[in-house]
Amino acid sequence: MTPQAILDKFGPREAMEYDVLIVGGGPGGLAAAIRIKQLAAAQNKEVSVVVLEKGSEPGAHILSGAVMDPKAMTELFPNWKELGAPLSQPVTGDDVYILTETGSFRTPNALVPNCMHNDGNYVISLGNVVRWMATQAEALGVEIFPGFSAAEVLYTEGGAVKGVATGNLGIEKSGAPGGGFQLGMELHSKYTVFAEGARGHLGKQLIAKFMLDANREPASYSIGIKELWEVPAAKAQPGKVVHTAGWPMDASTFGGGFLYHLADNKVALGFVRYTFALVVRTHVQLLSILQRIRCQNQWSY
């Protein structure tokens, strides 16, 4: 059965009304929800805010082991340290290496672009930061619905966005409703914020419908791989940040590598593009760190 046929047979869907609906419980979506509730409280207004998150919990689909500038966090929560935000590992060193097939050379700091300098930043697990932000959002009265993906954009008769519908549950491989079938619900709102991240499936629909990419440069994307390694204490350099360029890519290929020393003897190693991720591990610059250690997890993003 098609989704429309299922709706015709089992509908109408239950609908819930909110002032603001945010699709996506990542750092951007949660920051928007938190700020809206903060502004409403400052003006003594009641504004209902709901966040729809497809992951089983906030942070479940966050893959980045990132370097974070705390400026935005400070603007959102000036007392984030007292609140226990998981930004505990400041950057202690920052290097950019150009790799060749057999060696490497460190780029002098004076030649490194300002955007690549990480003084005052923190090496974090973004998943942990998102989970903490979700707790803060709920404390402010934000409703978070984890485990529900937005499947369809809903429009008014005039063509304006009025919300989204969640996907049906319990659909068999054939497309027919199964034993645990549950019809999706509609979330209506005065304002809908789409915070799906890059290449969100609803975002692509909206871009096409409203021609948001007309007369714009095409966006470009690359797939990368990140691995989490456990290193011996003697090799750990908590807070050390390393970025690489050059080998194994040629001069016409965009991409590069990163190596972030986290707390607890963990290292986040990644490379964009993913096709070079296994090759770059063999470089002498990385082998000096990766010898006799073990990989805990691997993600593509």
Predicted regions: what they are:
Residues 46-103:
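N-terminal FAD cofactor-binding segment of flavoenzymes
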